[in-house]
Amino acid sequence: MKVIEVKHPLIQHKIGLMREADISTKRFREIAREVGSLLTYEATKNLELETVKIQGWNGEVEVQQIKGKKATVVPILRAGLGMMDGVLEHMPSAKISVVGIYRDEKTLEPVPYFQKLVSNIDERLAIVVDPMLATGGSMISTIDLIKKAGCTRIVVLVLVAAPEGLKALEAAHPDLEVYTASIDDHLDEQGYIVPGLGDAGDKIFGTK
């Protein structure tokens, strides 16, 4: 599995702001979108292009466009919605697939409860977004669902990742590319990332 920790100064600055204990819902939500946008830029740099002819202002001209079907964005509910618009800023025609998974607070195991994938996901690049990769359970379950639907091109965008989650994800799906702003230190006894961002879902939706 290829893991890219994006060290761009803008991303590192913004992640630092998100770690503040008293950050407002508005600010946290804004930065989650911004970092999602910046990670998308990095994660799509190797998309295949093709030459097409269009009608320009003074006649026919050859231009470069992304080849084949465009991507589908796959936010993991609910926190993944906070990064979705950042992806769509760069790929506004991308289709949206949704997967709902919550983590059982006692067992820390993922519990799927909803999925709605685009019908031709097997022809698209799936960009899976979730702010936190902690134990990796929710992400693994999501990738399982996407692959079962026939998708073979998958990249993962997370704001912060724990080493334990990355290890588990690699064991389950070694063919992935993962882009993150930070690989943090460890998980605590409750399965939260340290230093982490706190509960990203609560902070994005104002339910903290």
Swiss-Prot record:
For activity, the cofactor(s) needed are: Mg(2+)
GO MF terms, alphabetically ordered: GTP binding; magnesium ion binding; uracil phosphoribosyltransferase activity
Q: What class of enzyme is it?
A: transferase
Q: Which NCBIfam families match?
A: PRK00129.1 (NF001097), upp (TIGR01091)
Question: What UniProt keywords apply to this chain's record, in alphabetical order?
Answer: Allosteric enzyme, Glycosyltransferase, GTP-binding, Magnesium, Nucleotide-binding, Transferase
Pathways per UniProt: Pyrimidine metabolism; UMP biosynthesis via salvage pathway; UMP from uracil: step 1/1
Q: Where is the signal peptide?
A: none
Q: How is the cofactor bound?
A: Binds 1 Mg(2+) ion per subunit. The magnesium is bound as Mg-PRPP.
According to UniProt, the name of this protein is: Uracil phosphoribosyltransferase
Q: Which family does it belong to?
A: Belongs to the UPRTase family.
What InterPro entries does the record point to?
Answer: PRibTrfase_dom, PRTase-like, Upp_B, UPRTase/APRTase, Ura_phspho_trans
Task: Give the EC number(s) under which this enzyme is classified.
Answer: 2.4.2.9
Q: Which GO terms describe its biological process?
A: UMP salvage; uracil salvage
Keyword GTP-binding, does the record have it? Answer: yes
Gene name per UniProt: upp
